[in-house]
């Protein structure tokens, strides 16, 4: 637990304030939070709908100018590491593969999408975020966002900002 933060998780636990699905934040009003932090969450949503829906929900609950701090396994980095047979033995490469596809220790520990900087930025922009910035680390919590394999950080950490104002719809053309 960290003061000032509320924790949502799909599974109950001692540090969990809200049990639920991060794709449906209907329990929270629009513009409820100045910041949303999600470390190694997005890869658990399918790329064909749920991922974008989750990002739109997170956008909805942020105040104008709010920041989404996201960390995901960096598919480009993991793919590069997986191919380094001279550096990692088969067991180590198997663990890298698990970082790509999930540990499969329970029904929720499965990765349904791989994200790199380009893919993640596209999803964030499609959800309405602007000014997507890559950051070396978030430093908010001791979690997987700081994970390294060998000496290589494996997480893609970004901040994405909700615009201060939403562009008004254009008026209908006069007849």
Predicted regions and their residues:
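Short alpha-helix immediately C-terminal to the canonical SAM-binding loop
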Residues: 15
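Conserved SAM-binding loop of SAM-dependent methyltransferases across substrates and taxa
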Residues: 1-3
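A short acidic, Gly/Pro-enriched loop at the edge of an enzyme's catalytic core
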Residues: 20-37
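A short SAM/SAH-binding and catalytic strip from SAM-dependent methyltransferases
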Residues: 34-49
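Conserved SAM-binding motif I beta-strand of class I
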Residues: 7-8
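Boundary detector for helix-to-coil junctions that initiate low-complexity/charged tails
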Residues: 170-175
């Amino acid at each position: 637990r960290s003061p000032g933060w509320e924790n949502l998780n799909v599974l109950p636990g001692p540090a969990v304030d809200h049990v639920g699905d991060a794709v449906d934040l209907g329990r929270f009003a629009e513009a409820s939070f100045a910041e949303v932090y999600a470390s190694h969450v997005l890869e658990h949503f399918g790329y064909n709908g749920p991922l974008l829906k989750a990002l739109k929900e997170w956008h909805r609950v942020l105040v104008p100018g709010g920041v989404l701090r996201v960390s995901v396994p960096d598919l480009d980095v993991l793919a590069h590491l997986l191919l380094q047979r001279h550096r990692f033995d088969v067991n180590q490469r198997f663990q890298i593969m698990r970082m790509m596809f999930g540990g499969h220790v329970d029904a929720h520990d499965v990765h349904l999408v791989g994200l790199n900087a380009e893919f993640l930025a596209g999803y964030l922009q499609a959800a309405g975020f602007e000014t997507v910035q890559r950051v070396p680390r978030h430093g908010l919590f001791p979690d997987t966002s700081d994970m390294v394999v060998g000496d290589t950080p494996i997480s893609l950490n970004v901040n994405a900002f909700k615009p201060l104002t939403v562009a008004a719809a254009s008026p209908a053309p006069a007849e």
